[in-house]
């Protein structure tokens, strides 16, 4: 197995969109937690084990996940939270239209401070790896339907919907950023991430429809006037 490699991942988005829950439901390997009061952030180091064309014998990846610890409720985040990031998971709540409207502002803040990352293998400057994450897709009374989400297409970033209560698609945001950071679209988990048991169970038809809609919104280009 190749030597472990580590990356800094930041979680951004309005409060109560599920950022902290997303991290704490991952219980793979050793769980480390650190709080840095100067920038109001909790850091959790999560290990993932992957394999692909670039690492056929497998590789351990350590994600140092920086969580706001609720600081976004008090007038934004300090610039130090963003500095030297390799990847960003940008959250909104599909049951709250305001959190989706605020995605643009969060995206702007991130790229004002950290528009690029240093490639792990070449040392070149590359765009920050970012994934748009719509949480709480298990709720039937959604305010934001999958088909209406367009922000990711205007920025050419992936969009994933997840359910913290169901563990639905929970591995996809991490897998997406790992493929970008390791420059390898064939990357898969060689060991499935261990998650806390699901609180609910979405029916198979709902799961299938959401993933079908996600495939459509991730592959259909925006109209010229959007």
Curated annotation (Swiss-Prot):
GTP binds at residues 14-21, 70, 135-138, 163-165. It comes from the Eukaryota. GO terms for cellular component: cytoplasm; nucleus. GO terms for biological process: protein import into nucleus; ribosomal subunit export from nucleus. Residues 70-86 are annotated as: Switch-II. InterPro entries: P-loop_NTPase (IPR027417), Ran_GTPase (IPR002041), Small_GTP-bd (IPR005225), Small_GTPase (IPR001806). One of its GO terms (molecular function) is GTPase activity. The keyword Chloroplast does not apply. Keywords: GTP-binding, Nucleotide-binding, Nucleus, Protein transport, Transport. Found in a nuclear export complex with RanGTP, exportin and pre-miRNA. Belongs to the small GTPase superfamily. Ran family. This is GTP-binding nuclear protein Ran. It comes from Giardia intestinalis (Giardia lamblia). The lineage of its organism: Eukaryota, Metamonada, Diplomonadida, Hexamitidae, Giardiinae.
